[in-house]
């Protein structure tokens, strides 16, 4: 990208010498006003925590349950336990009799009727398990309004009927024996992986003049040489903005200050350019370090945010990718946080679209019923900063594919 009135700088150096890189620092790098992607849920969960705001109701203590529950309907309870539309269903995390692709994040409930748990205990554990375990992964189903009190009584009645260990006709239905299947696609084949086509678009944009009459190539003529390690050292802390910038936000702000192009984060142009630049670093070893007090503070905040409970379902990043890592939520395998970011942006087959790290973070929030933040949110930046360091030593593998 052109640097008007200054010596030509190789962009790979800018992550280390950020004050030398022209940046527009005042405007939002995200579309304004930010609105959720058109094909995502339109629901508003403003009564629950986001990565920025506190709104979720506090733990209310034990609920009163007098004697055995006699008005619960076990058939209704079973239907609720299997209903994916009501928060993912109990099957997302637990084995139940007759289940298809149950998860194993939580304990096997197929014999819970033999455990000797009282109705009071079962009711309160479903209503808000935090009264027993503050750090539980179990969503506060009643306290957060997913299920009514009557529905929870029905679910208790159903659980009390479960006294026989579950059996599976297909080994793939048993999460404790299920194997991860190898992908049927080849991400390195441009005919199979549409991300290569987006990288080609990024290459064209790299040589396309912006409103100021210059292109990225005007100053960075040898892209393959200049960018062979750049992506492996992003994100970086930008002292002029006192925040972390990743590749996509850097592209937005550097282009505005040089070529005059306005490639907003999550636009096709921005993602295509980011994909192209990362392909030039394909095979480079990721190496993000925290040396200054500011860098260490931002990384520490990212680590802290990964433990933050958000949304109506009250999940944290580390619930799924720490405590439950290498287990199954229904048919989805939960990978650990380590070595997760080297392939972004990637083509997500289930969505037929290119996904950046920020879109992935937004999606995780919406999946647990938390309102997402704009893609240039400093909270996401800190999380990506810390997460990328967990991939240190692995290699950039953009463009990739995933389901």
In which residue ranges do the predicted regions lie?
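Beta-strand-dominated extracellular/periplasmic modules and repeats
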Residues: 55-56, 61-71, 79, 83-96
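Residues immediately within or flanking Cys/His clusters that coordinate Zn2+
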Residues: 87, 213, 314
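Post-cleavage N-terminal segment of exported redox proteins
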Residues: 1-74, 120, 124-128, 152-199, ...
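Surface-exposed interaction/gating patches
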Residues: 203, 209, 278-330
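Gly/Gly-Pro-rich "capping" loops immediately C-terminal to redox-active cysteine motifs
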Residues: 78, 82, 91-127, 143, ...
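Methionine-biased hydrophobic packing positions in alpha-helices, especially
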Residues: 137-138
């Amino acid at each position: 990208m052109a640097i008007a009135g200054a010596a030509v700088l190789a962009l790979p150096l800018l992550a280390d010498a950020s004050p030398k890189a022209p940046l527009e620092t005042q405007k939002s790098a995200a579309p304004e006003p930010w609105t959720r992607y058109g094909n995502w849920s339109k629901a508003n969960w403003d009564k629950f925590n986001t990565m920025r705001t506190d709104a979720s109701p506090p733990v209310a203590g034990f609920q009163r349950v007098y004697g055995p529950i006699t008005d619960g309907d076990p058939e209704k309870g079973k239907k609720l336990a299997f209903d994916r539309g009501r928060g993912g269903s109990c099957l997302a995390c637990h084995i139940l009799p007759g289940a298809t692709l149950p998860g194993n994040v939580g304990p096997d409930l197929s014999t819970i009727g033999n455990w000797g748990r009282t109705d009071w205990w079962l009711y309160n554990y479903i209503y808000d398990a935090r009264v027993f375990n503050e750090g539980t992964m179990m969503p506060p189903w009643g306290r957060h309004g997913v299920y009514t009190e009557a529905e929870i009584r029905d679910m208790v009645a159903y659980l009390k009927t479960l006294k026989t260990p579950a059996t599976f006709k297909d080994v793939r239905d048993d999460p404790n024996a299920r194997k991860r299947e190898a992908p049927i696609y080849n991400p390195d084949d441009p005919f199979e992986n549409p991300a290569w086509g987006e990288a080609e678009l990024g290459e064209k944009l790299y040589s396309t003049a912006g409103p100021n009459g210059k292109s990225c190539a005007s100053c960075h003529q040898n892209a393959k040489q200049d960018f062979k390690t750049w992506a492996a050292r992003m994100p970086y802390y930008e002292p002029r903005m006192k925040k972390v910038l990743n590749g996509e936000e850097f592209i937005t702000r550097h282009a505005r200050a040089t070529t005059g192009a306005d490639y907003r984060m999550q636009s096709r142009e921005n993602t295509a350019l980011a994909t192209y630049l990362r392909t030039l670093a394909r095979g480079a070893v990721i190496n993000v370090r925290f040396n200054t007090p500011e860098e260490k503070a931002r990384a520490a905040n990212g680590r802290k945010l990964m433990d933050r409970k958000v949304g109506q379902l009250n999940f944290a990043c580390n619930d799924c990718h720490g405590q439950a890592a290498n287990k199954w939520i229904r048919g989805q395998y939960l990978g650990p946080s380590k070595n997760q970011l080297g392939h972004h942006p990637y083509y997500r087959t289930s969505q037929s679209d290119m996904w950046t790290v920020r879109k992935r973070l937004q999606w995780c929030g919406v999946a647990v019923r938390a309102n997402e933040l704009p893609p240039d949110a400093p909270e996401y930046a800190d999380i990506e900063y810390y997460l990328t360091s967990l991939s240190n030593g692995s290699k950039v593998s953009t463009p990739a594919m995933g389901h």
